[in-house]
Structures are given as C-alpha cells and as structure tokens.
A protein has these predicted regions:
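Hydrophobic faces of well-ordered beta-strands that scaffold small-molecule active sites
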Residues: 4-9, 33-35, 58-63, 93-95, ...
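A short, acidic, amphipathic alpha-helical segment used as a generic capping/interface helix at domain edges
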Residues: 228-241
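Acidic/histidine-rich catalytic cores of soluble enzymes
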Residues: 133-230
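Conserved, mostly hydrophobic/aromatic
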Residues: 25, 33, 51, 85, ...
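N-terminal pre-domain/capping segments
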Residues: 1-91, 269-278
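Alpha-helix-loop-beta-strand connector modules within alpha/beta enzyme cores
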Residues: 50-64, 124-127, 131, 158-164, ...
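Acidic-and-aromatic substrate-binding clefts and catalytic sites of carbohydrate-active enzymes
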Residues: 10-17, 32-47, 65-76, 101-104, ...
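Active-site acidic/histidine proton-transfer and metal-coordination neighborhood
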Residues: 39, 71-169, 261-262
Length: 278
C-alpha cells in the first residue's frame, strides 16, 4: 500500500524566521507545503533549492480569488500564474472565492444568487481554457456552502462538477465537506476522479463554523487538531490512499488551545498512527 505524504497549508509564524520554521516542520515529518515561495526575499532559484534541501516540496500554488472573468481577461496575470506554476513544476493551480461563500466576508446566509453562480462558472471555464493551453490545470478549494446551497434542487457542488469544464479538479477540504452536512468519505468516492489534492481538517462542532465571518474573530471557532474532532479523519486518509492521492495536507484555519507547532506535531502523529501516512 502506497502511503500519503504529509504537507501543511497556513501555519504561518510571521514573527519567526521562515527558514527555521520550515526546518522544524520538516523535522516533525512533513514533506511539502501547499503554497509557494514566490514572494519571499532573496533569489527564487536559491530559495527553492534551500526548500528542497530540507526535504520539502511546493505542492500547490494559488492563482486567483475573486472575479474569474476579469482574471481570464488579464493576459498579464494569466502569464504570471503560468510562469509561477512552471517554475515550481506544478500541473495545476488553485482558485477560490466564488459568490457562494460571500457569507464569510459579510454575514451568515449571504450566499450569492443563481445568476452570480452562472457568472462564476463562465469565468472559471474561461480561466481553465487559457491555463490549459499551457498545460496548467485549475483546482477549486471548497468550503461548506457548496453543499448547503442549492438551486432548483441541485447543490452548488454538483453545478461545479457538471457545468464547469471537466478539467476542473477539486482541492477537497474534507472538514468543510463535513460541516456542509455530507459524509466526506462517501463524497471522496463519488468525486474520486475529480480530486486534485486533499486538505485534511477537523472540527469539534458542525454548526458553529457555518457562521464564520472573517471580520469577526470571535466567530472563527470550531477548528481543532486532527483526531480531536468529529470528522472521520482516518476514513478520509484511508479513502485518499484507495483513490490514489499523494498528499494529506493539514489545514487548521484558527488554533484552538495548542500552538501551531504543537498542532502540526499532534496532527502529523495522528495521521501517521492511522497507518495511511508515511
């Protein structure tokens, strides 16, 4: 059985030397980071070499959040994303922030409209076409709203899987799938051919995170270290192995009681103990 490799996303320590942080994360047992080094000080080639010498890989890069149609029409931005992807030897980049998750930046229940979703989908298709000409794919990072919001009885997630160019892959966040009221293991089986990467996230409450508003820190709760919440983490890791995924990317939007390094250590050990992560 081929095991998953552990990676992380976020867990930034802005007041610390990033290289010392990366070295410590590698020492825990992590092999990669979802995010790139593009904006770091220093020479990009040397930075990447240093990162790789720590035994770490750049797993993914973000392309755009927001208006897809505007992004698709900006040839300079498209070229920059392609350059970045090629530099890190990535076959896909990530997008997020369509209208259905508007509640995170406004108020609970503000999930856009059907027409706004169709606008988003049109833009996504345009981006996929332009990136595809250069051999770069597009991944979409989900939250819970794609599963709770429906139009004419069809969930937003099903619209994304059927109305968007089938080259679209999911950067599937299993925790948010669960918050959306869907069994993440069952959904992974359903969408197994459309999953590009896995974000492994745990929650101790299913309802509270739905009311998150970015501008209100008191609402950023419900997240917890892997294995201490209610998401079937072991089942998700097992299914990840079964469907041929390479990475288990740990994400926790807000710390609960642990420091970032304590959390990453505990999460890694929980995944390794499952037997599905090396």
């Amino acid at each position: 059985m081929s095991k998953l490799k552990a990676a992380w996303v976020g867990f930034r320590q802005p007041d610390a030397d990033p290289w010392k942080v990366y070295e410590r994360y590698a020492a825990i047992g992590y092999h990669g980071m979802d995010g790139d080094l593009w904006e770091m000080e220093g020479d990009r080639v040397e930075n990447l070499k240093h990162f790789n010498d720590l035994g770490l890989e750049v797993v993914s890069s973000w392309a755009v959040r927001g208006d897809m149609k505007e992004f698709a029409a900006d040839d300079q931005k498209i070229a920059e994303v392609i350059e970045r992807a090629h530099f890190y030897n990535l076959d896909a980049v990530t997008m997020g922030g369509i209208s259905v998750i508007s509640s995170f930046n406004s108020y609970y229940g503000n999930n856009g409209t059907y027409d706004e979703l169709m606008y988003d989908i049109e833009g996504m298709n345009a981006v996929i076409e332009k990136l595809g000409r250069e051999g770069i794919g597009l991944m979409y990072h989900n939250h819970y709203q794609e599963f709770t919001v429906s139009y004419d009885g069809v969930s937003v997630m099903d619209y994304l899987l059927t109305d968007v160019d089938r080259r679209l892959k999911l950067k599937l966040d299993v925790g948010w799938v669960w918050v959306g009221g869907v069994d993440p293991v069952a959904f992974m089986e359903k969408a197994k051919d459309r999953i590009g990467l896995l974000h492994i996230k745990d929650f101790y409450d299913q309802e509270i995170p739905r009311h998150l508003v970015n501008q209100k820190p008191e609402t950023r709760i419900g997240f917890t270290m892997l294995g201490t919440g209610k998401v079937d983490i072991q089942g998700c890791l097992k299914k990840g192995v079964e469907i041929g995924q390479k990475w288990a990317i740990v994400e926790q939007d807000t710390m609960r009681n642990l420091t970032m390094e304590e959390d990453l250590t505990g999460s890694f050990l929980a995944m390794k103990e499952s037997g599905y992560v090396e």
